[in-house]
Amino acid sequence: VLLGTACAALTPQLRAQTLVWEDNFNGPAIDGNTWTYDVGNGCQIGLCGWGNGEMQYYTSRPENARIENGRLVIEARREAFQGMPFTSARLKTEGRMHFKYGTLEARIKTPVVGNGLWPAYWMLGTIGVWPGRGEIDLMEAGMAAAIANGTANRRIGAAVHWDYNGAQADYDTSYTHPVDLHNDFHVYRMTWDPNVIRMSIDGQQHFEFAISNIEGASLHEFHQQHYLLLNLAVGGTFTGINTPGGVTAPLPGKMEVDYLRLYQNPGASLYVGAQHTAPAGRFGVFTDQTDTAARLTFGQDAQLYLWNNLSPIAQAPFEGGNVMAYRANAGTWYGLGIQTDYRDMRNYAGGSLKLHLKTTTPSTFKIGINTSFGDSWVDFVPGGNQYGLVRDGVWHEVSIPFIAFYDLDLQSVKQMFMLVADPPASPVEIAIDKVYYQSR
């Protein structure tokens, strides 16, 4: 599906003059208020090779990502690590900085990419499941076609991906720069407004895509906030290289970023998590009467989703006038989740997730929280740590220390409460009430 147009000459930019966000990488270390990491080989989220056949293991080690001479350095290395032949890093601002519309500028130096390195500077939407969340690729290098014609170190690509009638849709262009890109820094700019996305390198526009008034496509993916990603992959479908021996690019290879700057455009919105930190104390997730410093309001900033095999049942609440009470049939998994906008809950580190739960089921279930690191779960196995739960059909307070959740990023919480179970052997009735976060 092709819904955009590409231009060879730079048209007038809608660049505003108001700088609303920047990272100049001048600190002693990568700013954790802005950046977090994807770690692993993708298998942990069901996307081995990150869905692209990549051969690196992403880490958060300084060997792979650090500040050096006022620049962000992402370094790919040939080394055996966690069963993979290479290491590198992928940084993202998910849950920390998102924006909709604006002029985004980055000064980047790519490594020698031929053959096998794949530096990328891109964005993902904050809502939905790919491709329905939308993807904007501002710069990718090391593509197979450029390797084939000898322009790997001069050619870049830009693209957008979205959902079109339930299928993946794409639009992409490529541009061959007059000089090798690895010898110096180059300025990559995107202008994004309600009508169009444009991209340029060193003032030369090479991509334009209309995102309004397109027959048969809402393109809603490009009218919501996105977050940034920076990574240096090794191998994969984009490069056409799928064996370690095929990687001939010099290693270690470094992608360096001098700065990122966002200027405000008409209709723009910006979210910076550190400016919206939830106050310490108690934060109400699903509670009517608990004294809280802040709380979710369902239908406004939160939604309860019944994912599968849950039917409401009559049950008196533990408190107030509302309760989550459901029946799950035998033989089918069941689950629910409370979703909200990203929330910075850092003040609750060292605290606990508290709730009241009532059930008699002997089967295993798990309670979780979703953050920028993915899903984090605590299992409730008969005979194991029940965190206060007694399966006797009476209300009991359950208190789970946040430290019990593996790999939890409280600075970017998306699903504040989840409960999931594998198919039970017999029907289950379960009731949940008075759910809140308690700080230390």
Label the predicted regions:
Residues 1-9:
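Bacterial N-terminal signal peptides
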Residues 3, 195-197, 363:
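Glycine-centered loop/turn positions within well-structured domains
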Residues 10-16:
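Sec/Tat signal peptide C-region and signal peptidase I cleavage site
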Residues 12, 132, 226, 363, ...:
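Residue-level signal for beta-strand positions within conserved beta-sheet cores that form or flank
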Residues 16-275, 420-421:
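GH16 jelly-roll
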Residues 71-72, 270-440:
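Beta-rich carbohydrate-recognition modules and glycan-binding surfaces
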